[in-house]
C-alpha cells in the first residue's frame, strides 16, 4: 500500500476476549463501546516462521509440564530485527513461558498438566489447558457440570481407554485418552512456536525409565507430523544425571576417566522412582567421551507429591467438618500431637499405614459432614453429585496451595484458610472463594456462603508429612544400606518439586552422610522455585546440544530393571510359588503347571511389603493351541524359556511360563501343553504390572 497509516490496538483480556467472540462466533450482541489504547505504527512486516534445527524438549510431568530449547547464533540471524531477540538468550537454554491467568497474567515456566472441556459442538471438543483450565474450574458454580482431568501422564499406560466428556450445557461425548494427551502436547508445542517464532520438526519428550518404550510408541502415534528423538531420547533419570555431568564438566569438577556412581530419587506428582547410574567422563582431542550405564532400581507408583497434598487435605477436611457440626470427631490438634514422637522408629516397627490409621479413620467419619467421595453420588441428583465433586477439587486445590506456600517460602509460620480477609500476627491468610463448599445438614447437602476459618502451622505440617516421606525413603534406601552398597555412591540427586521439603534430606541422613546429599543439590536452590522441576528439562536440552554440535560422544547402556513387584501362583497342593521375584534381576521368570483339564490360572501381584494388590485371571482356549517344536518355542521367546523345562512337560500337563517384560512394564504368560506326546503352544497373554484396578488415583471420586 502506498498509504502507510497503521494503528495497533492494545486492550486488556476482557476486551480482547469480547472482540475475539465477536469475530469468531458471529455474536448477535455488539457492545456499544470498547476500551483500548491506539498506538500509531509506521510499518509492519509479516514474516514466515523459521524452521528450528534443534528439537523442542518437553518434560511431560504428572502435575506440571515444562518445555525449552537451546538457541544458537544461527537462530538469531534468522530473527534479524525482531524485538523478541531482546528477550531471548543467545547460546543458552530458553524456556517456554506461560501466562498464569489467575495471577494477573504473570509469566511462569510451569504449565499444570490439566485439561478442561470448554464445549462440545457436534462432536468437536474444545479444550482449555494448564492455568486456563484451572481458571475455568474456579469460575464454575457448584451445581454446574464441569469436566477437568488431572494426572494425564498416568494415562499413557492405558491410552486407548475411553473417557466421558461433558460440557456445561450437558453435551456428552466419549473420546480416547490418547486424544486428550495429544491435544495437551500440541498446546505446549503451540506455545513454544508462538514464543520462539519457529516451527519444530523434531521433539524430545522425556519418559519414565520403566515405561520408556511405551511412551515412545504412544508419542509416535499421536504426533506423527514430528520426528521423535527416539534414538536419542533420555529417560527422566538419565536426563537428571546428564545435567549433573554437564555441571561437573563446566566446573571442571571431575577426574578424567574415573568411574562415578550416582543414585537418583525422582519424586514426581504421581510416582516416585529410584535409578542408579555409573558414568565416566573422558576428555578426548575433539570431544568428551561420556559413558553412562543406568538401571531402574525401585519405585512406588502410589507415592508422589499428590500423596502429600492428600495428607494436607485430610487435615483440612477434618478441621472444617468439626466446625460444621462434627463434634464427635477427634480434635485435629490431638491427632497431630500423636505424631510428635520418634515417628521414624514407628515406621520401622509398624509401617506407614499404622502411623496414619487414626487420621484415616477420622477422615472417613468426616465424610458424613463434608462429603468428597463423588463416585458414591453418581446415582444421586445432578446438584448433589456436582456439589460433592466440587468439594473434593476445592479442598484438594486448597491443600496444594497450602503445601506450596509453606515449602516454597521459608518465612511462613502459620496460615489461616478463610474466605474472608484476616489480619493476625505472624499469620498468612490464604483467601479462598465463597459459595464453593457444601456440607450435609439435616440429611440435605447445603452450600456454605463462607467456609469456617482453618489454621495450620509449619510445625504441624512437618509432623503430618514425616511418616510418609520417611516411608518412601526407607523403601528405597534401606536395602542398599543393609547390603553396605551406599558407600559406593558419590552422588545422590533429589529431583522433583516435592524434594524441596527438607524432610526428604532429614530422612536420607538416617542412611547416607549429609555431604553426599549436599553435593547433589545446587547451592541456593531453595531460592529457585522451579529449579528442581527444571533439572530434567535442562539435562535433556544439554544432551541434545552436545550431541547435535558434536561436543560430546555419549554412549548410554541400560541394565536390566529391578521390578518392585512379586508375581505368585498356587500349586495344586495350595502351596504358593513365586514366579517373578521383587528387586531380583536374576529371577524374573518362572513357571507353574496345571492339569490339561484346567486351562485357567490365577496370578497374584504383591508389592514390596508382601501386600496383595491385584489378581490376574489367565484363561486359555484349547482350540487355539498349535503344535510346535521345542526349539521353535525357545527361539520365539529369545531363550527366556529353556528347552529343558519344555522337555520336562509330561502328557496332559499344561505349563504356564511367566516372563517379565521390561519394555512394556509387565509380564507375558505363555501356555505350553503336551498332548499325545506332542508339544502344543497356546497364544501368549500380556499383563501390566500397574493397572487402574489397584493403582491409587486421587481423582477417581473415592477419596
Question: Where on the chain are the PLM-derived regions?
Answer:
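Terminal low-complexity/disordered tails
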Residues: 1-17, 25-37, 47, 474-481, ...
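N-terminal phosphate-binding loop and flanking beta/alpha elements of the actin-like ATPase fold
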Residues: 1-99, 145-261, 278-301, 305, ...
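Phosphate-binding loop and its immediate beta->loop->alpha context
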Residues: 1-13, 89-203, 207, 217, ...
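Acidic, glycine/GT-rich loop-and beta-edge segments that sit at the periphery of enzyme/chaperone cores
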Residues: 1-27, 324-346, 518-647, 651
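Short flexible coil/turn linkers enriched for glycine and charged/polar residues
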Residues: 61, 267-271, 561
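Short beta-strand scaffold segments in enzyme catalytic cores
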Residues: 65-69, 113-117, 272-277
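Helical "lid/coupling" subdomains associated with nucleotide-phosphate turnover
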Residues: 181-184, 309-314, 318, 357-554, ...
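Metal-dependent DNA phosphodiester-chemistry modules and their immediately adjacent helices/loops
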Residues: 263-277, 549-552
Amino acid at each position: 500500500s502506498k498509504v502507510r497509516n497503521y494503528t495497533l490496538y492494545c486492550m486488556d483480556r476482557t476486551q480482547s476476549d469480547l472482540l475475539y467472540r465477536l469475530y469468531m462466533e458471529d455474536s448477535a450482541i455488539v457492545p456499544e463501546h470498547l476500551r483500548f489504547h491506539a498506538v500509531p505504527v509506521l510499518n509492519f512486516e509479516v514474516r514466515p516462521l523459521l524452521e528450528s534445527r534443534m528439537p523442542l524438549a518437553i518434560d511431560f510431568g504428572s502435575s506440571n509440564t515444562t518445555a525449552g530449547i537451546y538457541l544458537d547464533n544461527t537462530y538469531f540471524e534468522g530473527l534479524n530485527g525482531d524485538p523478541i531477540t531482546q528477550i531471548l538468550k543467545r547460546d543458552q537454554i530458553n524456556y517456554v513461558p506461560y501466562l498464569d491467568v489467575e495471577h494477573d497474567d504473570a509469566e511462569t515456566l510451569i504449565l499444570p498438566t490439566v485439561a478442561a472441556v470448554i464445549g462440545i459442538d457436534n462432536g468437536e471438543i474444545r479444550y482449555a489447558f494448564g492455568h486456563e483450565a484451572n481458571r475455568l474450574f474456579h469460575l464454575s458454580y457448584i451445581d454446574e457440570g464441569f469436566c477437568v482431568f488431572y494426572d494425564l501422564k498416568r494415562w499413557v499406560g492405558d491410552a486407548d481407554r475411553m473417557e466421558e466428556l461433558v460440557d456445561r450445557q450437558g453435551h456428552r461425548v466419549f473420546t480416547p485418552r490418547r486424544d486428550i494427551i495429544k491435544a495437551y502436547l500440541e498446546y505446549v508445542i503451540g506455545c513454544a512456536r508462538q514464543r520462539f517464532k519457529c516451527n519444530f520438526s523434531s521433539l524430545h519428550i522425556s519418559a519414565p525409565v520403566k515405561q520408556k518404550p511405551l511412551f515412545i510408541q504412544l508419542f509416535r502415534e499421536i504426533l506423527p507430523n514430528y520426528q521423535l528423538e527416539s534414538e536419542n531420547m533420555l529417560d527422566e533419570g538419565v536426563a537428571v544425571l546428564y545435567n549433573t555431568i554437564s555441571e561437573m564438566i563446566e566446573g571442571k569438577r571431575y577426574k578424567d576417566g574415573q568411574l562415578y556412581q550416582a543414585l537418583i530419587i525422582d519424586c514426581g506428582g504421581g510416582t516416585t522412582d529410584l535409578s542408579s547410574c555409573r558414568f565416566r567422563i573422558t576428555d578426548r582431542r575433539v570431544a568428551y567421551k561420556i559413558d553412562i550405564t543406568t538401571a531402574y532400581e525401585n519405585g512406588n507408583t502410589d507415592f508422589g507429591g499428590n500423596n502429600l497434598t492428600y495428607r494436607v487435605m485430610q487435615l483440612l477436611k477434618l478441621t472444617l467438618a468439626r466446625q460444621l457440626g462434627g463434634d464427635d470427631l477427634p480434635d485435629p490438634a490431638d491427632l497431630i500431637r500423636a505424631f510428635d514422637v520418634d515417628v521414624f522408629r514407628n515406621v520401622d516397627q509398624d509401617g506407614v499405614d499404622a502411623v496414619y490409621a487414626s487420621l484415616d479413620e477420622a477422615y472417613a467419619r468426616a465424610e458424613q459432614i463434608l462429603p468428597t467421595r463423588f463416585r458414591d453420588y453418581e446415582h444421586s441428583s445432578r446438584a448433589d453429585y456436582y456439589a460433592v465433586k466440587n468439594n473434593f477439587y476445592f479442598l484438594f486445590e486448597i491443600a496444594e496451595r497450602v503445601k506450596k506456600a509453606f515449602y516454597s517460602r521459608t518465612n511462613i509460620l502459620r496460615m489461616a484458610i478463610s474466605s474472608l480477609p484476616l489480619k493476625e500476627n505472624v499469620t498468612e491468610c490464604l483467601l479462598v472463594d465463597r459459595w464453593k463448599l457444601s456440607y450435609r445438614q439435616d440429611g440435605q447437602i447445603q452450600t456454605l456462603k463462607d467456609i469456617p476459618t482453618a489454621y495450620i502451622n509449619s510445625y504441624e505440617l512437618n509432623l503430618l508429612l514425616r511418616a510418609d516421606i520417611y516411608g518412601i525413603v526407607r523403601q528405597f534406601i534401606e536395602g542398599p544400606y543393609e547390603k553396605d552398597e551406599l558407600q559406593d555412591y558419590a552422588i545422590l540427586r533429589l529431583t522433583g518439586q516435592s524434594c524441596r521439603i527438607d524432610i526428604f534430606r532429614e530422612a536420607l541422613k538416617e542412611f547416607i552422610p549429609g555431604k553426599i546429599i549436599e553435593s547433589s543439590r545446587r547451592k541456593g536452590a531453595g531460592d529457585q522455585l522451579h529449579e528442581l522441576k527444571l533439572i530434567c528439562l535442562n539435562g535433556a536440552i544439554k544432551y541434545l546440544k552436545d550431541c547435535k554440535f558434536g561436543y560430546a560422544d555419549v554412549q548410554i547402556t541400560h541394565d536390566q530393571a529391578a521390578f518392585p513387584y512379586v508375581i505368585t501362583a498356587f500349586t495344586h497342593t495350595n502351596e504358593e510359588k513365586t514366579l517373578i521375584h521383587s528387586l531380583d534381576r536374576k529371577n524374573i521368570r518362572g513357571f507353574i503347571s496345571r492339569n490339561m483339564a484346567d486351562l485357567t490360572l490365577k496370578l497374584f501381584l504383591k508389592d514390596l511389603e508382601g501386600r496383595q494388590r491385584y489378581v490376574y485371571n489367565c484363561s486359555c482356549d484349547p482350540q487355539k493351541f498349535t503344535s510346535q517344536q521345542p526349539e521353535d518355542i525357545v527361539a520365539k521367546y529369545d531363550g527366556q524359556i529353556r528347552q529343558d523345562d519344555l522337555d520336562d512337560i509330561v502328557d496332559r500337563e499344561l505349563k504356564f511360563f511367566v516372563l517379565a517384560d521390561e519394555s512394556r512394564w509387565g509380564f507375558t504368560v505363555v501356555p505350553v501343553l503336551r498332548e499325545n506326546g506332542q508339544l502344543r503352544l497356546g497364544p501368549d497373554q500380556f499383563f501390566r504390572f500397574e493397572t487402574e484396578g489397584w493403582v491409587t488415583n486421587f481423582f477417581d471420586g473415592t477419596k
